[in-house]
Structure formats: structure tokens, C-alpha cells
Amino acid sequence: MFQGETAITVDDKGRMAVPTAYRDLVARVSGNRLVLTYNPFEAGCLWLYAEKEWERVRDDVMSKPNTQRVVRTLQQKLVGSSAVLELDANGRLSIPASHRNAVGIEKKAVLLGMGDKFELWSEQAHRALIQQTLSDGDLGDELLDLRL
């Protein structure tokens, strides 16, 4: 569904323009609404889901018993901190200040299309991610035969 990397500028009001290549798709699959939440696995990154896909993720996460701290933390970061955003007439999303501040997004960010969701990275965190290299030891057996 979504793929590619786009440099994003965030204005003083916390608005970012969704790339024009994605606007029709977002309108079609999600009625111009995306759900924003924290990436619980990597610092410096937010996730943006189309509403239907978000509902699947939310329901799956909330179906887990919250008797373990890791499950409660996941539920808090994903569901408790989520926000429904709507594209304005100019194709922009207003990213809440709390989310921007938590992941270090200021003026520059990077939007990655990751299939069923977007990842919105602070420019600094994205640069650090790209500079990391993977070794064979980092890959599980199921990925060793992947042909890239």
C-alpha cells in the first residue's frame, strides 16, 4: 500500500503535508483520516495507520491480558497515546505537540511508507537508523535466505 521515503517539513503549528502521491490513496482507504501513535520499538519514530488497519492493530493489542507489564506498556504506547488526525483541505496533518516533542520532531522529518502504515521519523533518528548496518548475526534464520 504505502512505500517510499519523503523528506517532510513541519511548520510552526505542527502541520506536515502528506505527499501528493499518497493523498488519493489515504482518501480512498481511510476517508482522509489517519491514526497516529508511538512506535513502541524505536525511539524517534511515530506510526500513522489508515483507520481500518488501525482498528485491527488496536483490537489485537487490546485483546492481550494486561497482567504483564510489557503488555500494559504496549497498550499505553499504542492505544492510550493514539490520536485520530484528519487531512485538511491542503492535504496537511496536524501532529500534536506532545507526540512531536516525545520523538524529537522539530522542523525536519522523514516519512517512510511501510506497507500497511507510515513511519514518521525525526530527521536525526532516521539518519542514525540509515547509518546502522546489519550483519548475518542480526538476521534470524527465516531472513538468511532472503534475496535482496
From Swiss-Prot:
Residues 5-53, 82-125 form the SpoVT-AbrB domain. Its main location: cytoplasm. GO terms for biological process: negative regulation of DNA-templated transcription initiation. Pfam families: MraZ. InterPro entries: MraZ (IPR003444), MraZ_C (IPR035644), MraZ_dom (IPR020603), MraZ_N (IPR035642), MraZ_sf (IPR038619), SpoVT-AbrB_dom (IPR007159), SpoVT-AbrB_sf (IPR037914). GO terms for molecular function: DNA-binding transcription factor activity; transcription cis-regulatory region binding. Keywords: Cytoplasm, DNA-binding, Repeat, Transcription, Transcription regulation. The keyword DNA-binding applies. Transmembrane segments: none annotated. Coiled coil: none annotated. The keyword Transcription regulation applies. GO terms for cellular component: cytoplasm; nucleoid. It is found in: Cytoplasm, Nucleoid. Forms oligomers. Belongs to the MraZ family. This is Transcriptional regulator MraZ. It comes from Xanthomonas campestris pv. campestris (strain ATCC 33913 / DSM 3586 / NCPPB 528 / LMG 568 / P 25).
